From Swiss-Prot:
GO terms for cellular component: keratin filament. The record marks G334 as: Stutter. The keyword Lyase does not apply. Residues 412-452 are annotated as: Disordered. The gene is Krt80. Residues 252-390 are annotated as: Coil 2. This is Keratin, type II cytoskeletal 80.
Amino acid sequence: MAYRSCVVGFSSLSGCEMTPAGSPQPGTSGWGSCGLPGPGFSSRSLTSCRPAGTIPKVTVNPSLLVPLDLKVDPAVQQQKNQEKEEMKALNDKFASLIGKVQALEQRNQLLETRWSFLQGQGSATFDLSHHYETFQGRLQEELRKVSQERGQLEANLLQVLEKVEEFRVRYEDEISKRTDLEFTFVQLKKDLDAECLRRTELETKLKGLQGFLELMRTVYEQELKDLTAQVKDVSVTVGLDSRCHIDLSGIVEEVKAQYDAIAARSLEEAEAYSRSQLEERAARSAEFGNSLQSSRCEIADLNVRIQKLRSQIVSVKSHCLKLEENIKVAEEQGELAFQDAKDKMAQLENALQKAKQDMARQLREYQDLMNTKLALDIEIATYHKLMEGEESRMDLPSATVVSTVKSGCRTTASKSGLTKTSSRKKKNRRGPVIKITEMSEKYLSQESEASE
């Protein structure tokens, strides 16, 4: 049979236009005109329908309240025709309600399917925490290895620094010894120079004494010549004077012998003194020469050792530079690895946070879906009650006027029942919402504890 199009609005659902086939017309996408779900079904399409109208009021003719007149009246036939029209309207409304109930059942099935899909997706997302923990453990193991390598490098650096300190102390000791030896060498050189000067002075004195000795010899010879000449003169005089018989030759010989003895003694003393001084100076010069030679040998040995120490210091410095470069490279690599680990840790934390946010969003969507499902269940129950009331009203055999009165009363009762069911719906909405919120908070707290 053909039905008329009607507009019925309830809660957040819009009116549905019925086709002659008795099924609602689907929209182009989503829930178009509150019909069947299209291919673009989403959580937003649940609230995309706007109410197109409200349930029309059932008007009661006041003349029906007048006591019945059993006489045949033309108004009775008119009243029956009016009741037939009302029955047709109610049948159309009933057919629209049946189509809406079917659409709501399909919508409920879609919501259940989506809820199961979201639960599977949430469990899969939650299972990724094991992979995150494994990757985090591997990064921590790498960080521990890098820390151990850094500790070993620091220990090697301390050993190298100790060796460098030991070589530095030895180098300072050698420098101090070299300084002492150089000071000793300078002192010995000063003593050698002083001895050379003294030797030169002694040689000069020896030459002066030899010159003085020659001079004294010349003087003595000249005096001897003078005395000889005087003796000759005296002898001549004596020869002339025959009265004096003085023997001057003996005196001259005696004086000459005395002078010769004095000159010989002076020469011997001078030669002995000069020889002793020369021997002493030669001994001291030989001693200083030996000490100088030993000092030169020691200086040569020290120079060789200094060269060796310098080469060792250069090699140690180069080794220290290489170790410092290796330490810098190791520190840079450790810092890069640590920074990479921190970045990966931050990425994992961001991914975990994003997963938590996705889980919370899915929980909120689930909560919204459950609220929508609850509202739809309440609407379905209300429609079932309305249909049961309509069926019970249609099944009761009674007179035309009484049925009309009863239908009006039932319509009023259905309105009151609708009001009661809507109030119950508002009351019952809070219970599951609170339960879902508590469940989501409990799940988020467990997830945060597991991540910690």
